[in-house]
Amino acid sequence: MKNYINNYDRATAHIACVGMGWFPKTPGGLDRYVYELTHSLAASGDRLSLYGLDLPEAEPNPGVELINLATADSPLWQRLWLTQRNFLNKQPVKVDAINLNFALYSLPLLPVLPNKVPITFTFHGPWALESEKEGESKLGVFLKQSLVEKSVYRRCDRFIVLSQAFANILHLEYQVPSSKIHIIPGGVDLKRFQPNLSRQQARLQLNWPQDRFIIFTPRRLVKRMGLDKLLQAIAEIKSRIPDIWLAIAGKGPLQLALEQQANELGLNDRVKFLGFLPDCQLPIAYQAADLSIMPSQSLEGFGLTLVESLACGTPALCTPVGGMPEILTGFSPDLITSSCEATAIAQRLEELIMGQIPLPSRAACQDYAATNFDWHKIAFQVRQVLLT
């Protein structure tokens, strides 16, 4: 296997990357992606200028320069004005490529982006459509899509998406030509996410029960994540699988409603709401579980949780939504439920737990993740698109 860690067999490039927040302070999928990409490229010899909000003053990696654009809690107009001003004032004299990652903070940069530098937008999701799913007004959705997203996308030379599902959305909803779209999956840091603990050791560290079948899901507690469906599914099978135990990590506006639902379903001794789980404990939680799950109901562009879980040696179950099936189809199609409904989730959980469908081994999970989603390999593919 080719070693991508030390060098990509090419001249060093200077790449400017405009993100959003700072991982792990804001542990969302976009921020994690930008962090891992920039640090993987820097580890291979490139020079990275990373722009974002609330970035720290110091970065131990000498190949990554951090440029703070604004503070996230400032008024929107001020954030956008400062984003443009600070990007313009601290723009490198010479840069080989620019990678944008979030439309809102890319919008004020449009007048000041250099003309002869390739601009690539990494499409992490349809911001307007996600807002609509969370109850945004029709006017708000229209403004986000027409005045922000489409304006930014018209300026970009090419696009990276993490799945065919999001390539379709980018083409159909935003009229981006298919010829400009490159599909490159997300990656996982195999040094952090690896099976280095026994299940018993991991459970002991987290103070989780040793004698239960544990399902783990790290999710934002919002509607489209499908946690209400998952709770219904657990309630359906609890009488037949009394030792089932669900651990939910994450925060969000639905926390009280979900806790109330769990109580009404009689799941207090079978569901644990962990709240915010520090990033350092995430690999431990995956290893402590018998199974991870993503019960998403809509707009799941990739499914990083699935890959992280597999890298830790733990099988992962998903609903047939967005890009998630693209991860698991080539590995174990039985880890995809037949629908998003609670009954389908319950049926597949019961089949897996009762052994009617065998769960992949720890070694098979880790090997599949390492072969297909190693960040160093993914970063190499991204770099090729950025510099084309």
Regions from the PLM with identified roles:
Residues 16, 209-225, 231-234:
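Conserved donor-binding/catalytic core segment of Leloir-type glycosyltransferases
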Residues 100-105, 123:
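Short His-centered aromatic/hydrophobic patch
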Residues 140-159:
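Membrane-proximal helix-turn-helix segments that form the acceptor-binding/catalytic region
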Residues 165, 187:
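Carbohydrate-associated surface elements
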Residues 259-277:
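Nucleotide-activated donor-binding/catalytic signature segment of Leloir-type glycosyltransferases, i.e.
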Residues 276-277, 285-289:
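Short alpha-helical donor nucleotide-sugar binding micro-motif in glycosyltransferases
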Residues 315-318:
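Short hydrophobic beta-strand element within catalytic cores of glycosyltransferases
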Residues 330-342, 351-357:
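Conserved acidic donor-binding segment of nucleotide-sugar-dependent glycosyltransferases
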